[in-house]
Amino acid sequence: MARPFFRRRKTCPFSAKNAPKIDYKDTRLLQGFMSERGKIVPSRITAVSAKKQRELAKAIKRARHIGLLPYIVK
């Protein structure tokens, strides 16, 4: 008989009390939510809530537009 699958309870890293604010100028924080190729990692992998994922995507796109982050990494 196979082991039952237990889902790990995921909590949003931006919903905690001392959580960092999402800011387009904080490239080190934003790069943690991007793949090594420069793509935005989905929230089902990073455990970010839907609201914060939208804010995160907007901040990454804004940072890309003004040249702080690359669109694609070769």
Curated annotation (Swiss-Prot):
Any one GO cellular component localisation term in the record: cytosolic small ribosomal subunit
Domain of life of the source: Bacteria
Keyword entries, A-Z: Ribonucleoprotein, Ribosomal protein, RNA-binding, rRNA-binding
Pfam family, one: Ribosomal_S18
UniProt keyword annotation of Disulfide bond present: no
A single MF term (Gene Ontology): small ribosomal subunit rRNA binding
Family per similarity comment: Belongs to the bacterial ribosomal protein bS18 family.
Subunit architecture: Part of the 30S ribosomal subunit. Forms a tight heterodimer with protein bS6.
Function: Binds as a heterodimer with protein bS6 to the central domain of the 16S rRNA, where it helps stabilize the platform of the 30S subunit.
The protein, known as: Small ribosomal subunit protein bS18
